[in-house]
Amino acid sequence: MLYTVSHSPYHCDLSALLRLATSEDDILLLQDGVIAALKESEILKLLLNNPASLFVLEDDVIARGLVGQISDNATLISYTHFVDLTLRHQQQLAW
């Protein structure tokens, strides 16, 4: 399953997502969801303790002026890689 998080982590229930995600899943932070990948944030720690892989859309990081503030533990990806993730996962859930 591909979980896409496009809302600020302060305006959505990420704890519910984390209860569902498994090691076979990917989580993609995009739009305002990229805030969840800020270095040293408590939300980031929760995401990194989850077995799912964590990706962050680089264009949205740049658009929000957050370059250099995103954790190195989150993988920055391009729109091309985003498309690859959608092809890899038959099921997707927007969060």
From Swiss-Prot:
Annotated family: Belongs to the DsrH/TusB family.
**Entry protein name:** Protein TusB
Instruction: Say yes or no: keyword Oxidoreductase present.
Output: no
Which GO BP annotation is one of this protein's? tRNA wobble position uridine thiolation
Q: Self-association or partners: how does it assemble?
A: Heterohexamer, formed by a dimer of trimers. The hexameric TusBCD complex contains 2 copies each of TusB, TusC and TusD. The TusBCD complex interacts with TusE.
Please, which domain of life does this record's source organism belong to?
A: Bacteria
Q: What Pfam families does this protein map onto?
A: DsrH
Q: What role does it play? A: Part of a sulfur-relay system required for 2-thiolation of 5-methylaminomethyl-2-thiouridine (mnm(5)s(2)U) at tRNA wobble positions.
Subcellular location, record wording: Cytoplasm
- InterPro entries from the UniProt entry: DsrEFH-like, Sulphur_relay_TusB, Sulphur_relay_TusB/DsrH
